[in-house]
Amino acid sequence: MDIIKNLKSRFDSVQCDFLIAIAAIFLPFYITVVIHAIIFFKWIKQGEVKKGYEETKRSKYIIFFSALIFLTSVFYQNWPGAGVSLGYLMLYSMTLVYRRHASEELFDTMLNLVIGLSVFASVWAIIEYIFILRQFDLEGWYLVVFNAPQYRTNAMFFNANYYAMMIEFFVAICFYKFLKHTHNHGFMNHIKEIVIIGLITLLNLFCLYLTGCRTAWPALAGGLAIMLLFNRNYKSFGGICAVGAAGVGFFIAKPQYIPRMSNIVKYLGVRKHIWEVAIQNIKTHFLFGEGPMTYWHIYAQYNGHPTQHSHNIFIDPVLCFGIIGLLVIAPFFIENIKRLYRLLRT
């Protein structure tokens, strides 16, 4: 109760709602959606969403985009896509409200909350992993990552790959806090916080290994390197590049340590087939796509591999939204990129 009273004394009602929304991300996704929807409709009633759109340049394109992809999904009877379209509208709108109420203290508290709850997710994932081992009559502790998705830990994040994506964010946030604490030679002044952040980072990296998601590792290394570049830590950037190169060399020499190495050839073949199916559908629906989750909606038509998306950040947007859809939302993103550029120059 003291924690709740403390938060209420430091933040207004909307800011407290944001902390609840962040915490809800660590619950099963259907509970997360319900909590976010309750908060969203509360803000609509309070006029917060309307003010967010009025005060944010090019934000009207969010409504145009969401309406377009919703109608496209309905036209093609892509019902999961129709639901996700409404989710896009809700989440985009919530970010506009956040911009109105953002403060350095709120931002820092949100990051601390995510870091703390990532420990909860890690503990849950390890317990989940122990139960997975018991399904194979493996007593004690074995560091084995299975190929089948149902035997890879996900910590309530829908599936192992989604949990791996979240871990990338957790580690990036920890890295940001590390950079912040070591800025201007402040290492010794924050030694306790740095040690805690380091331990939490290692815990999350261990759980990332348990997810068996191989592509998360180079993506994470690249993301941290970009953070160093933006922070002008060129020596550290060179260091992380060297570590990354050493890691590549190690796995080339010792491929048996790559998670799920036994099916890597099959995995590459599956990815290739997924992309081929996606490209086939793009050829016939290149203007509007078929809405969010298009791959999940169409894979059976092409005898494709069953999965939720096309596993490619370049193919999937075109597959789902088409050229017209991407052009509709482009002004909003361009405006935000300009704003970020101006911020970086100051």
Where in this protein do the model-derived segments appear?
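Hydrophobic alpha-helical transmembrane segments
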Residues: 321-333
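Transmembrane signal-anchor helices characteristic of membrane glycosylation enzymes that use polyprenol
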Residues: 25-28, 119-123, 245-257
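Extracytoplasmic catalytic-loop and juxtamembrane helix elements of membrane-embedded
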Residues: 133-152, 259-274, 294
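Transmembrane signal-anchor hairpin modules in multi-pass inner-membrane enzymes, especially those
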Residues: 1-74, 80, 91-93, 97-115, ...
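Alpha-helical transmembrane segments of multi-pass inner-membrane proteins
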Residues: 108-141, 147-148, 155-230, 241, ...
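Long extracytoplasmic/lumenal interhelical loops at the membrane interface
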Residues: 262-276, 280, 286-321, 340
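Membrane-embedded alpha-helical segments of multi-pass membrane proteins
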Residues: 28-46, 83-95, 163-171, 217-225, ...
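Membrane-interface helix caps and helix-loop-helix hairpins in membrane proteins
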Residues: 74-82, 209-210, 259
